[in-house]
């Protein structure tokens, strides 16, 4: 039951991600289509212009111009109704009805300063570079989203698509601002004319604005898809690592937590190199050195972590005999050290002490056998031999006797006294 529930959850998540990618793809091509239609059509602006050569007179009126009651002159002609786009203007009324002409952004009768901001705006408006750039970026973003459905392992594709969509939206809104700022409300040649005509924006202009909104929405959606995929990939890699650690440590009983407790290879390498350099600088241990004394050999803590001290069974009888021999004076020792101590305490001879010291040695075994050298045994000798006894002091002379030197001096004195003069 739990597996079925988990499968349903995974299927729901996958469907949700698939829906997001599908919506992003559809939105990308929809925004591209809207922007393409807006660029290629001539319904950005509705206004009146004198380019159509129309008058306010009725079509069948052949009489003189109509004058007001006060004798005023003919009413000024506001021009015919036109619709314009980024490239041309078309007449809807007058003698040139249905005729479209190219928009002249720089009339001959007008002198423009080439360093002015108005001139630069008209140049950008005439080139229409920002709307075209927006359409190109939208097309590239849609292709990247479609490719991300095929190459699902490459998450950077969907991220690049999101960046392209955001850049396309920014380019679109810049183009709209430039279009409004370049005085596109009156494309007629007379700029000095009093601007009393009303104008309105057409559906091409609104298509461009809708393309901007779609570009920003699908850009945010694409970035969100990238974040979710990256998070899922990170969690999947971490779970795979833990599973691999659990399978490797299952035989040893350590589990996946053993991987987390392992030190880094660099730290182990530094410790090992430091211990090897320290061991090479020290002198090689002699067979008479004690393993626990201050002058003993230094072993690397990383190579041999634990030792057990044991007595060689072949030397047990000799050590026991020495211990029993020295038990009268110094008591029985334990192991090899006990035999040597008993021989020394019992007042034994130097040869017996040497035999005890040579017989009482220890064997060190590595508690964790290694694969390369599983049967290696390190042998270190026992305690150093006792120092040689000092020479015996000369015996004191008995009471009432003279030493040889004193007797010789007395003899010389007697000889002097008995010699005749």
Swiss-Prot record:
Organism domain of life: Eukaryota
One GO cellular component, as annotated: Schaffer collateral - CA1 synapse
Biased composition (Polar residues): 408-421
Major subcellular location class: membrane
Classification via InterPro entries: CACNG_subunit, PMP22/EMP/MP20/Claudin, VDCC_g8su, VDCC_gsu
Region annotation Disordered: where it falls in the sequence: 271-304, 342-363, 378-421
Modifications the protein undergoes after translation, according to the UniProt entry: Palmitoylated. Probably palmitoylated by ZDHHC3 and ZDHHC7.
A biological process term (GO) from this entry: regulation of AMPA receptor activity
Composition skew (Pro residues), residue ranges: 384-397
Pfam family for this entry, one: PMP22_Claudin
Phosphoserine PTM positions: 251, 254
Residues that span the membrane, as ranges: 19-39, 127-147, 157-177, 207-227, 318-338
Compartment annotation: Cell membrane; Postsynaptic density membrane
Protein keywords: Calcium, Calcium channel, Calcium transport, Cell membrane, Ion channel, Ion transport, Lipoprotein, Membrane, Palmitate, Phosphoprotein, Postsynaptic cell membrane, Synapse, Transmembrane, Transmembrane helix, Transport, Voltage-gated channel
Recorded topology in the membrane: Multi-pass membrane protein
Oligomer status and interactors: Interacts with CACNA1C. Identified in a complex with the L-type calcium channel subunits CACNA1C, CACNA2D1 and either CACNB1 or CACNB2. Acts as an auxiliary subunit for AMPA-selective glutamate receptors (AMPARs). Found in a complex with GRIA1, GRIA2, GRIA3, GRIA4, CNIH2, CNIH3, CACNG2, CACNG3, CACNG4, CACNG5 and CACNG7. Interacts with CNIH2. Found in a complex with GRIA1, GRIA2, GRIA3, GRIA4, DLG4 and CNIH2.
Purpose of the protein: Regulates the activity of L-type calcium channels that contain CACNA1C as pore-forming subunit. Regulates the trafficking and gating properties of AMPA-selective glutamate receptors (AMPARs). Promotes their targeting to the cell membrane and synapses and modulates their gating properties by slowing their rates of activation, deactivation and desensitization and by mediating their resensitization. Does not show subunit-specific AMPA receptor regulation and regulates all AMPAR subunits. Thought to stabilize the calcium channel in an inactivated (closed) state.
Name assigned to this protein: Voltage-dependent calcium channel gamma-8 subunit
Name of the coding gene: Cacng8
């Amino acid at each position: 039951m739990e597996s079925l529930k988990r499968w349903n959850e995974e299927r729901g998540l996958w469907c949700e991600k698939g829906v997001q990618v599908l919506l992003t793809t559809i939105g990308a091509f929809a925004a591209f289509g809207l922007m393409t239609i807006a660029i290629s059509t001539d319904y950005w602006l509705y206004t009146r212009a004198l380019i159509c050569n129309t008058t306010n007179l009725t079509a069948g009126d052949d009489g003189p111009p109509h004058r007001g009651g006060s004798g005023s002159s003919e009413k000024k002609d506001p021009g015919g109704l036109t619709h314009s786009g980024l490239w041309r203007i078309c007449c809807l009324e007058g003698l040139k009805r249905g005729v479209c002409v190219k928009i002249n952004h720089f009339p001959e009768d007008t002198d423009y300063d080439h360093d002015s901001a108005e001139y630069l705006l008209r140049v950008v408006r005439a080139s229409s570079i920002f709307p075209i750039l927006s359409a190109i970026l939208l097309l590239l973003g849609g292709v990247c989203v479609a490719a991300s459905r095929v190459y699902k392992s490459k998450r950077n594709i969907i991220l690049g698509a999101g960046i392209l969509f955001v850049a396309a939206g920014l380019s679109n809104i810049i183009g709209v601002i430039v279009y409004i700022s370049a005085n596109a409300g009156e494309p007629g040649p007379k700029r000095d004319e009093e601007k009393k005509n009303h104008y309105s924006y057409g559906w091409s202009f609104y298509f461009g604005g809708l393309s901007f909104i779609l570009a920003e929405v699908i850009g945010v959606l694409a970035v969100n898809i990238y974040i979710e995929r990256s998070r899922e990939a990170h969690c999947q890699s971490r779970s795979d690592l833990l599973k691999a650690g659990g399978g490797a440590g299952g035989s040893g009983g350590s589990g996946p937590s053993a991987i987390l407790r392992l030190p880094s290879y660099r730290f182990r390498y530094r410790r090992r190199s430091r211990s090897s350099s320290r061991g090479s600088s020290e002198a090689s241990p002699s067979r008479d050195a004690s393993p626990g004394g201050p002058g003993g050999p230094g072993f690397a803590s990383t190579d041999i972590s634990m030792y057990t001290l044991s007595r060689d069974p072949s030397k047990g009888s000799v050590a026991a005999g020495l211990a029993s021999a020295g038990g009268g004076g110094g008591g029985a020792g334990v192991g090899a050290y006990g035999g040597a101590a008993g021989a020394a305490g019992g007042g034994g001879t130097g040869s017996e002490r040497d035999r005890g010291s040579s017989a009482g040695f220890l064997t060190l075994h590595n508690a964790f056998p290694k694969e390369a050298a599983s049967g290696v045994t390190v042998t270190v000798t026992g305690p150093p031999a006792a120092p040689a006894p000092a020479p015996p002091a000369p015996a004191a002379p008995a009471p009432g006797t003279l030493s040889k030197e004193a007797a010789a001096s007395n003899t010389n004195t007697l000889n002097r006294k008995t010699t005749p003069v």
